[in-house]
Design a protein with these regions (language model features):
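Sec-dependent N-terminal signal peptides
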Residues: 6-11
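N-terminal signal peptide c-region/cleavage motif recognized by signal peptidases
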Residues: 14-16
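Non-catalytic cap/lid and distal C-terminal segments of serine-dependent acyl enzymes
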Residues: 20-26, 30-65, 70-360
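Positively charged n-region of N-terminal signal peptides that target proteins for export
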Residues: 1-4
Length: 360
């Protein structure tokens, strides 16, 4: 009897300790923060019972904000229409504070990632995306870049051509392999026989100076290209080098290609122009376009400008740029691969169009 009483007392003493480990369940335990509904709309959800306001920001349709309502269980819900298929960055804004989705399975460096539809990840042989660090001679610092190598590269004896693919303003070298889905897009194109094997280098075009375009172009020539050619089994002549960039990266593309036409055969300028706010004639003269037009026309196998349709914020500037370059004797092609404005939906479509044309 005495032993039974001691055991009962021990069980009673343990109850408060057990209660500390057994928290009350909440709707957040099983919450799915994003759901694609049968009609194509996306439902955003976040558990924030004490919040006063919730919104969502990111690569979402402009002019049609997602409106959230709070349920009695503390879950805020909002419907987004018009996304289409693809990969999108988003963040919740809770009481004015931007927060990443704590339940997102994929995240970029500064935002969560949502995949609508099948996305780009398919059952095909996949290449590798590696982070590499190099020393920049002109910037005098260690810098990072990403490199995509095709499936089977490790066993390949032959040398491959190289595409240098540059992001836009406000992003970095993680953007193309992240929200740009570059690795997956390239995997699929190669598996479908739509492009030749190549290496794709995604450098960091962001430099903390007032005008980062010229120093980045110098970094490309003096450090990035030599680093790649010293560390990868690549062809090292202009016929097997391509450069492409979006928005700010498009300005960097023109800066390096127009100043060094002897280094590249393929040049793609995506949603970009000569420096905004500057006289196009003066910028073209600074880049010696008229002086070198004959050399570039003969040396470039492709010079292509693209836009995301009239809603692309670079649309008018690009029109002015093309008019000036044409006046200065430079030949180029122009296309609109997607009517998605100044967005990653446009630039992913550009990459899907661009890559199959290279090194043929």
């Amino acid at each position: 009897m005495k032993r039974l009483l001691i055991l009962s007392a021990a069980c009673l003493l343990a109850l408060p300790l057990s209660a500390q480990w057994m928290r009350q369940p909440t709707p957040n335990d099983t919450l799915q923060s994003t759901r694609t509904l049968p009609d194509g709309k996306v439902l955003f959800q976040i558990y924030a019972p004490e919040a006063q306001t919730v919104s969502v920001t990111g690569d979402l349709p402009w002019g049609n904000p997602v409106r959230f309502e709070k349920a009695e269980n503390g879950v805020w819900k909002g419907l987004c229409d018009g996304l289409g298929e693809g990969v999108f960055r988003y963040s919740f804004v809770v009481d004015g504070v931007r927060v990443q989705d704590p339940k997102a399975p994929l995240s970029a460096e500064q935002a969560s990632l949502l995949t609508v539809g099948e996305g780009y990840v398919k059952d095909v042989p996949h290449g590798a995306v590696a982070q590499r660090y190099y020393y920049s001679k002109n910037l005098k610092q260690m810098r990072r870049l990403h490199v995509w190598t095709p499936a089977g590269y490790e066993k390949t004896a032959g040398k491959l051509p190289v595409l240098y693919l540059i992001h836009g303003g406000g992003d970095n070298d993680a953007s193309w392999p992240g929200v740009g889905a570059a690795g997956w897009i390239l995997d699929n194109l190669l598996a479908e026989g739509k492009m030749v094997p190549m290496i794709v280098v995604m450098p960091n075009g962001t430099i903390p100076v007032q005008n980062e375009v010229p120093p980045f172009a110098e970094d490309m020539v003096s450090s990035i290209i030599p680093f790649i050619e010293a560390n990868y089994n690549v062809l090292q002549d202009k016929d097997h080098r391509a450069v492409a960039g979006l928005s700010m990266g498009g300005m960097e593309t023109m800066e390096v290609a127009f100043n060094h036409p002897e280094m590249f055969s393929y040049v793609w300028v995506l949603s970009s122009s000569l420096a905004p706010g500057q006289d196009p004639a003066a910028e073209s003269a600074r880049l010696k376009v008229k002086e070198n037009a004959r050399k570039m026309n003969a040396g470039f196998k492709a010079l292509v400008f693209t836009q995301g349709g009239p809603t692309d914020i670079a649309y008018r500037n690009c029109e002015n740029t093309r008019a000036q370059l044409k006046k200065d004797g430079l030949r180029f092609d122009y296309m609109e691969n997607a009517q998605a404005g100044h967005s990653w939906a446009t630039w992913r479509a550009d990459l899907q169009t661009l890559a199959p044309t290279l090194f043929r």
